């Protein structure tokens, strides 16, 4: 069964600017789906439509079985949303904020308190629950926002760049929590600028560029589309041109980089030993070898023509 079904989704802004142009995608229940795209590609606009914050100008979308236009209320009750720039009242304590969110979802006061305490404990904020949010670090605020999005036990969770700007330890903590939620059955729709995050967490990845989906699949299948692994060979001595000629029997030589011979291996990693043997027989001494597998960054560049912009952690 599908948690999210999108067909021909469009959004045109005044002046004829079409930010989203015929997006089709489907997310199965229980999946983690990573949605990637360059700045201005239509990623945020798509998410805003799926979460009922923006009305489509064409096409259709159903989330948790409900139409995002005609059944927007049902959609909102079925989803949790944690935005990159969460509007958390700095004067409220973490506990007060969680309980307020629960009340807004119609949860009785006693149950709101119970759920709030359980969620604060889950995201590691029990000790800080009585402190004002204005004194929280970036990582703590992100965890509080995640807890707020979970207070009504949503079927589908939308996470908008949940770890942007966080230090590696905080980022890993969010990853672990998202994975745990998914194991419990929550469908996760994740936008991220960290390709490693998509590779680690997602069952499937969709890449949007120029308003439309340009690639979709598992991280492994998308990387396999780009090509075979390549071998970076550093030489003690000998001509790189001669080495490339010897290597031609095992794959396609690529342009030299930093004085190293690059070879796309047609037979995969199993050919490495044969390449070394052939170079040795030709009297070419090898100083270093590195087998480099295709990455999601390679996929992103191939499909969009751009590198994704990653912010430094802080």
What is each stretch, according to the model?
Residues 176-266:
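ABC transporter nucleotide-binding domain
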Residues 1-6, 10-22, 29, 72:
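A short, flexible loop at the N-terminus of ABC-type nucleotide-binding domains that lies
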Residues 99, 103, 110-128:
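Conserved ABC ATPase "signature" region
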Residues 153:
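Conserved catalytic motifs of ABC-family nucleotide-binding domains
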Residues 157-160:
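Catalytic Walker B motif of ABC-type/P-loop ATPase nucleotide-binding domains
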Residues 59-70, 75:
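Conserved ABC transporter NBD signature motif
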């Amino acid at each position: 069964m599908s948690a999210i079904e999108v067909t021909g989704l469009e959004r045109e802004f005044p002046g004829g600017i079409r930010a989203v142009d015929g997006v089709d995608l489907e997310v199965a229940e229980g999946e983690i789906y990573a949605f990637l795209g360059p700045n201005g590609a239509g990623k945020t606009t798509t998410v805003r439509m799926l979460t009922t914050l923006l009305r489509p100008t064409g096409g259709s979308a159903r989330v948790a079985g409900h139409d995002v236009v005609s059944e927007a209320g049902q959609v909102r009750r079925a989803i949790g949303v944690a935005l990159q720039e969460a509007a958390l009242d700095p004067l409220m304590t973490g506990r007060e904020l969680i309980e307020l969110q629960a009340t807004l979802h119609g949860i009785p006061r006693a149950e709101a308190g119970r759920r709030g305490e359980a969620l604060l404990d889950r995201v590691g904020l029990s000790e800080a629950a009585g402190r004002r949010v204005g004194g929280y670090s970036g990582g703590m605020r992100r965890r509080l926002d995640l807890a707020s999005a979970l207070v009504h036990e949503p079927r589908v969770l939308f996470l908008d760049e949940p770890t942007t700007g966080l230090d590696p330890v905080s980022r890993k903590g969010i990853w672990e929590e998202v994975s745990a939620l998914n194991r419990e059955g929550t469908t996760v729709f994740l936008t991220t600028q960290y390709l490693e995050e998509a590779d680690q967490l997602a069952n499937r990845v969709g890449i949007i560029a120029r308003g439309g989906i340009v690639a979709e699949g598992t991280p492994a299948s998308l990387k396999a589309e780009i090509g075979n692994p390549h071998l970076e060979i550093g030489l003690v001595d000998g001509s790189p041109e001669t080495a490339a000629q010897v290597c031609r029997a095992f794959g396609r030589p690529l342009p030299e980089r930093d004085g190293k011979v690059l070879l796309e291996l047609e037979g995969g990693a199993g050919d490495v030993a044969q390449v070394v043997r052939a170079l040795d027989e030709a009297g070419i001494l090898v100083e270093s070898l590195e087998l480099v597998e295709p990455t999601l960054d390679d996929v992103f560049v191939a499909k969009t023509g751009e590198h994704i912009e990653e912010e430094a952690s802080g």
